[in-house]
Amino acid sequence: MAVAMDNAILENILRQVRPLIGQGKVADYIPALATVDGSRLGIAICTVDGQLFQAGDAQERFSIQSISKVLSLVVAMRHYSEEEIWQRVGKDPSGSPFNSLVQLEMEQGIPRNPFINTGALVVCDMLQGRLSAPRQRMLEVVRGLSGVSDISYDTVVARSEFEHSARNAAIAWLMKSFGNFHHDVTTVLQNYFHYCALKMSCVELARTFVFLANQGKAIHIDEPVVTPMQARQINALMATSGMYQNAGEFAWRVGLPAKSGVGGGIVAIVPHEMAIAVWSPELDDAGNSLAGIAVLEQLTKQLGRSVY
C-alpha cells in the first residue's frame, strides 16, 4: 500500500469529512428511517488476512437497505445456474432512479440489473422458489459470513417499508404481467423488505463482504461463498450498477466496486486486499451517502488504490 493502514488514518479522514454533515438529507420516505441521527459517521476495514481497522461509529448498527441486494444475489447464485439467473435479470447499468417503472415497461419486464429495486425483486422471487424459509436462510448466511450470531431484522423498519410499498408492489405486478414474477407478490415483498431491514454495523459489514476481495472465500469459513469467477462478476456489477444512477461519478471519484443503501451505508471492495464499510445517514440527490462517498474518496487517495 502507499500508506500503512492504521486506525489513526481512518480517524483523520473522518475529521476531514465531518464538516460535510448537514449538507445531505436523511431518507424520509421510509418513516422509520427518518428518525436516524444524521450526524453519525463510521468506517471499518477488514483485510483478506483478517485484520480489522475502524473509526467513528463503526460498531453502531443501522439499516443496510440496498446493500442487501448483493447478499440476495449471492444466495441466488448458490441455488440457481448462471443461465437461470441472467435470463430474468440483466447486467447493465440502468441510468435511471432505483425504483423506475418506465424503463421496466419499455424492456418487457426484464430489469437492467439485480441492484435496482426491479432486479432485486426478481432475485427475491427466485429465492422464494427454491428456499423453504428465505428470511431465515438470509439470516443464516449473514450470521455465518460476519461471525456474529445476533444479527437480525429491524421489524419496525420492515413494517414501515411494507406500509409504504405501493411503488414496489406496482413493479412486481408489472413484471408479473410480463411473466417475469412467479410467486405471491405480498410474500416476496415481505421478504424483500426484511432483507433491506437487516441491521448491521460497519465492522459487521466489512467482515461479511471481505469474501468479495478474497476470490469468493470468507476468512473464517472453509467452504467458498462463491467461486472466484462469481466474485469477479459481482464486483463488476457493483462497479457498474452499485451506486444507483451515479455509478460513473463514483467510479471517477473513488474507483472501487461498491454498493450503497439509503440507510447511509456503502460497502466497497479492493480486490485481493480488503472490504471497506462506511456509514453516514445523510444522502445526496441520488440516494447515496454524501459523507460516506467523501470518506471513500479520501481513503483511496491516501492508500493509492483504484481498480482503474
From Swiss-Prot:
Residues that, per the record, bind substrate: 66, 117, 161, 168, 192, 244, 262
GO biological process, one term: glutamate biosynthetic process
Top-level taxonomic group: Bacteria
SUPFAM superfamilies for the chain: beta-lactamase/transpeptidase-like
Protein's UniProt name: Glutaminase 2
Enzyme Commission (EC) number: 3.5.1.2
UniProt keyword Lipoprotein present: no
UniProt keyword Hydrolase, yes or no: yes
